[in-house]
Regions:
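Glycan-recognition and catalytic cores of secretory/periplasmic carbohydrate-active enzymes
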Residues: 1-180
Length: 180
């Protein structure tokens, strides 16, 4: 839905036609239906609790693979644009939640080790597992990190920074570094 969201906003900016703004809002509502609006509770022994991961603002990977990822950081600039176009503060709040989630548990140095995996500076998990996937796995599996450190999570954050400018209010966030 992100390409449609962005296109609707581009067309609204170009034409001023309110129908495109309405379509952008429809895309935003749909996109928002895939995001966590709350922070789930996890045992103190979980990765989520130990490293300070919060579910609010995370995006569901898919219906059949309900992990959480930071894909929403890609759409954060469009939520800011929609806020500007409508004046509706909820869209800025959604952008902020998406951004905050996308900046959780980033390794700030080359010494961060999680689950035996040394994280490079700037490394972040590709997915966060809020639940266990099968009854054959232990319940304790809830709230764990995968250890796949791929580049798209960083690329999407960089896109948002490039689009909005580094000093944008969206990026004035509290400390979200990975707690050792």
């Amino acid at each position: 839905v992100w390409p449609l969201f962005r296109a609707a906003l581009d067309l609204f900016d170009e034409t001023g036609d309110a129908a495109y703004r309405t379509r952008a809002e429809m895309c935003a509502y749909y996109f928002d239906s895939w995001t966590y609006r709350y922070d789930a509770l996890y045992p103190a022994t979980s990765d989520f609790a130990r490293y300070g991961y919060h579910t609010r603002g995370g995006t569901a990977v898919s219906v059949q693979h309900h992990a959480i990822d930071s894909w929403g950081s890609l759409a954060a600039p469009e939520f800011v644009r929609l806020w500007r176009a409508t004046g509706d503060a909820r869209w800025f709040a959604r952008a902020r939640a998406l951004w905050h989630n996308a900046t959780l548990c980033i390794a700030l140095d080359d010494k961060t080790v999680i689950n035996g995996t040394l994280r490079p500076r700037g490394g972040q998990n590709e997915a966060f597992f809020g639940c266990r996937w099968t009854r054959y796995r232990p319940v304790e599996e809830r709230g764990h990190f995968n250890n796949w450190l791929i580049s798209w999570v960083n690329a999407y954050r960089l896109y948002a920074i490039h689009t909005l400018g580094f000093d944008h209010a969206l990026f004035q966030v509290e400390e979200n570094a990975c707690k050792p």
